[in-house]
Amino acid sequence: MKRSLLKTCSIIAGATIIFSSLSISRNPLEVQAASMRSASEIVQEMGVGWNLGNTLDAKITNLSYNTSPISFETGWGNPVTTKAMIDKIKNAGFKTIRIPTTWGEHLDGNNKLNEEWVKRVKEVVDYCIADDLYVILNTHHEGNWVIPTYAKESSVTPKLKTLWTQISEAFKDYDDHLIFETLNEPRLEGTPYEWTGGTSESRDVVNKYNAAALESIRKTGGNNLSRAVMMPTYAASGSSTTMNDFKVPDDKNVIASVHAYSPYFFAMDTSSNSVNTWGSSYDKYSLDVELDSYLNTFKSKGVPVVIGEFGSINKNNTSSRAELAEYYVTAAQKRGIPCVWWDNNYAETNKGETFGLLNRSTLNWYFSDIKDALIRGYKNVHPEATEDDKPSTDVTNPDSGNTKPDSGNTNPGTETTTPTDNEKISITSKINDWGGAYQADFTLKNNTSSDINNWSFKIKKNDIVFTNYWDVKITEENGYYVVTPQAWKTTILANSSIVISIQGTGKVISNFEYKFD
């Protein structure tokens, strides 16, 4: 996810933490490749998880290669990770820990990893393995060199493969509780395309980087021959464009990875459009539609999916945050999708990316109500973890209280181009029909040689009900939806296109009527 407050939201300065002296009883080398479970089997067991955020992923560019690992680990203000900290997560009922890890700062001029850094990462992984937790180990905050363009591909790929070869060798004998994740949110950082679905080129290169990392992992042998490997879409985005363009290598143990801080205006937004409450039938239905899009898209590609990051920030609205947390996890578990809460140990009210749940210095919970809600969400579907409690793919209709079976069919989309009265911009729409709900993807093409800023257009309502959107703001005016961009979508570069996605319910319209002011 976007981390604009990484250094400023460091917490608990001056706290003194001592390494735990607890022994680690589990042997992470005890499972051989022949007994490694499939990715699909593992996903069914991962449950609800927790991110050790802003810790091993602290990107400190002014520290030298030989700086002690602990200086990096605590560089953004978080305390040293201890076994007691991991025990706290385990005892709360979480089943998975994601360990975001930055490696680029620990490569020398020959792209060799610092052995002390590898040793420290293994130590933290071992804390988790000892507690029978699933562990997601990734490459995080590598965007300064993992740049998804054709121009950079030839230089990035060898370095990425060398990095993953070294990581894989270090962990090749760990059992199937360890899951690798090739990349975090690979994207065109600092460009208008960063959080808007990228370009066809960048999405293609992300697929190639994923495949290159997987190839390096498999070549190291041992348990890595069949280890579950997570792979993100472009920017780990759950938009229809990024998911549809996600390519799965010919490998039965791949897991798709998306990040879903949903709904955005409740979960992350701090602007004047922000909302502080959640829980209506409309809210729940919108989230169900979004989760169905993940399930159906990746099911059609033959892979399971994990939501590697989700959560909501502190706006002094704990009750609504807890309600969303429970519903989110329950709905995801019904669809067989594990969710991993992003925790950066920052919990102040109305201070930006305040996702913290556990105070890592005191080992007390900032928000025990939210923690309990997350675990309840899992237990709602798995009350006793019996055979009868396996996740289903039922879709809940919040208005009726009944469930309907997932048809398993996804309309790949019908595409139409509608002439507009604005020669500068043309619009193409593509409809992905899920049955009872749909997603409309609008491609806006700038037909001029100059950038277009602050665009807007109207869509005739025609009995349409739009329910969910992130990149735009929508108001109603004289029988039209008025669509205006969020700040990150205001510019359409010269001779370029952007894509916006709007989800809706009811009648599916194949030919929208557009109008420019």
Curated annotation (Swiss-Prot):
The active site is at residues 185, 309. It comes from Clostridium longisporum. Hydrolyzes barley beta-glucan, lichenan, carboxymethylcellulose and xylan. It shows preferential activity against the larger cellooligosaccharides (cellohexaose and cellopentaose); cellotetraose is the smallest substrate degraded completely. Gene3D superfamilies: 2.60.40.290, Glycosidases. This is Endoglucanase A. Belongs to the glycosyl hydrolase 5 (cellulase A) family. Residues 382-392 have a biased composition (Basic and acidic residues). Residues 1-25 form the signal peptide. One of its GO terms (molecular function) is cellulase activity. The keyword Oxidoreductase does not apply. Optimum temperature is 43 degrees Celsius. It catalyses: Endohydrolysis of (1->4)-beta-D-glucosidic linkages in cellulose, lichenin and cereal beta-D-glucans. GO terms for biological process: cellulose catabolic process. Residues 416-517 form the CBM2 domain.
